[in-house]
Design a protein with these regions (language model features):
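C-terminal flanking helix
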Residues: 68, 72-79
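Residue-level signal for inorganic ion chemistry
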Residues: 48, 71, 131
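Intrinsically disordered, charged and Pro/Gly-enriched terminal/linker segments
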Residues: 21-22, 26, 34-40, 53-61, ...
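Short acidic, hydrophobic short linear motifs in intrinsically disordered regions
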Residues: 42-50
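A structural micro-motif at secondary-structure boundaries
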Residues: 8-29
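Short amphipathic alpha-helical interaction segments
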Residues: 59-70
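Short, surface-exposed polybasic/aromatic micro-patch for ligand or macromolecular engagement
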Residues: 13, 34, 42, 70
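Intrinsically disordered or compositionally simple regulatory linkers and C-terminal tails
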Residues: 1-3
Length: 220
């Protein structure tokens, strides 16, 4: 059976062979997202309860166990009764998602960005473009208001913004400045406070033969 792949760079998803798996309700997806965020580490049951509810109901522990059972059936539908789970496992005081590094889009994205830094400059733009293409929307989109996603959402978003700017900078250095301009324009329309992006845009315009536009950017 093919591996299950997970997405958190946008709405939380799980797929097998390109087919979406039914994850039931928002709290099921919240449990899955919280385990993905933990990066294969165990999340104690009481921590899951605190993260899912501001004021946990009396049967919150049982509810989390039900959510986990439902998720296991969705992720491993062919697992024999009473056989231990291989993907969403019970360990010590809680649960962990033992997904492979390539099976979570956020993990693949980070690995690709790191790889681009090691590649020859001529190969780096394509690698960064492929990495950025994995984003389908804001990270952990449906849980943007949750305290437990805040730090990771901020970190991933900053990594994405830097990847856009780094790709443009490399294109300029390679003499492909005109290719960098449209992406930087779109980037700065959405994130106008990015000073480094303005600097790279001014340089890209200048190198592309649009000196007046480049100077206008610097004078903004």
């Amino acid at each position: 059976m093919e591996a299950v792949t997970f997405g958190v760079l946008g709405p939380v998803t799980a797929e097998r062979a390109g087919d979406a798996l039914a994850l039931k309700g928002p709290r099921h997806r919240a449990v899955l997202a919280r385990l993905i965020l933990a990066r294969r580490r165990v999340v104690p049951l009481d921590r899951l309860v605190r993260d899912l509810w501001e004021e946990p109901p009396p049967r919150a522990v049982g509810a989390v166990r039900t959510f986990v059972g439902d998720l296991r059936r969705a992720l491993e539908p062919d697992r024999p009764p009473r056989a231990p789970a291989r993907l969403l496992v019970t360990e010590g005081p809680g649960y962990a998602l033992r997904a492979a590094p390539d099976d979570v889009d956020a993990w693949r994205f980070e690995a690709a960005v790191a790889e681009a830094d090691r590649l020859p400059a001529a190969q780096a733009p394509d690698r960064l473009r492929a990495a950025l293409a994995q984003w389908r929307g804001p990270a952990y989109a449906e849980f943007a208001g949750e305290e437990w996603t805040r730090g990771e959402r901020s970190r991933l978003t900053e990594l994405r913004l830097r990847a856009v700017e780094r790709r443009a900078e490399i294109l300029v250095d390679l003499g492909r400045a005109a290719e960098a301009v449209p992406d930087l324009d779109a980037h700065l329309t959405e994130h106008p406070w990015r000073e480094e992006a303005w600097r790279v845009l001014a340089l890209a315009l200048y190198r592309a033969g649009r000196q007046a536009d480049g100077l206008a950017v610097l004078r903004r």
